[in-house]
Design a protein with these regions (language model features):
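Bacterial N-terminal signal peptides that target proteins for export
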Residues: 1-10
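Repetitive helical segments and hydrophobic/amphipathic motifs
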Residues: 13-16
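N-terminal signal peptide c-region/cleavage motif recognized by signal peptidases
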Residues: 18-20
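Short loop/turn and low-complexity linker motifs enriched in small/turn-promoting residues
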Residues: 23-55, 64-182
Length: 182
């Protein structure tokens, strides 16, 4: 009898965990993309590199991603990276909804280089439903300064008035400053 109850308990716990895993709310990061910012934060704790999913609460969010991966060219392997990141604005993420996108996945270095310059995507949720622009949209954050290794995407978005970062306070990381009293 105890063995039967134990089996039932383990089965029930497994079912509960699998339902919770399927009922996530967030953003699924496609292959060849890396997370740069989530709601203005770099390296968010809510991102699982294992499942490639950023766990989010329902509501408005912004995800900044860069295209970067290794691609084979004969016997060599080379890194191909986009100069400009994708900025995805999710206007109203619903509970139990996971947003992602589809794109023509490059199979080799030449295809990856071509894709990195244009980055055309189709936003959808994980059920395959294409999202209208009223629910989610994207743009490519271009720079008038050309290629730069250490771009500050948060500052660039803030200067354009397009940053969504509810926990970020602009200019808060400047250190100590003087007031009129010294």
């Amino acid at each position: 009898m105890l063995s039967k109850n134990l089996k039932f308990s383990v089965l029930a716990a497994g079912l509960l965990f699998s339902v919770n895993a399927m009922a996530d709310t967030g953003f699924k990061v496609p292959v060849h993309y890396n997370v740069e910012l989530v709601d203005g934060e770099s390296d968010p704790d809510s991102y699982s590199r294992f499942s490639r999913t950023v766990t989010l609460t329902p509501g408005k969010h912004q995800v900044v991603l860069t295209f970067k991966d290794n691609f084979k060219n004969g016997s060599d392997s080379r890194i191909v990276q986009s100069i400009d990141p994708l900025v995805i604005d999710i206007n109203n993420l619903k509970a139990d909804q996971v947003v992602t996108f589809q794109y023509a996945k490059p199979a080799n270095e030449d295809q990856a280089k071509r894709y990195a310059h244009q980055q055309k995507i189709t936003l959808s949720d994980t059920t395959g439903r294409v999202l209208p622009s009223s629910e989610a949209s994207y743009f490519i954050l271009t720079s008038d300064k050309g290629f730069s290794l250490m771009r500050d995407y948060r500052q660039e978005l803030d200067s354009l008035g397009r940053l969504y970062a509810p926990a970020y306070v602009s200019n808060a990381d400047k250190g100590l400053t003087m007031t009129e009293y010294g």
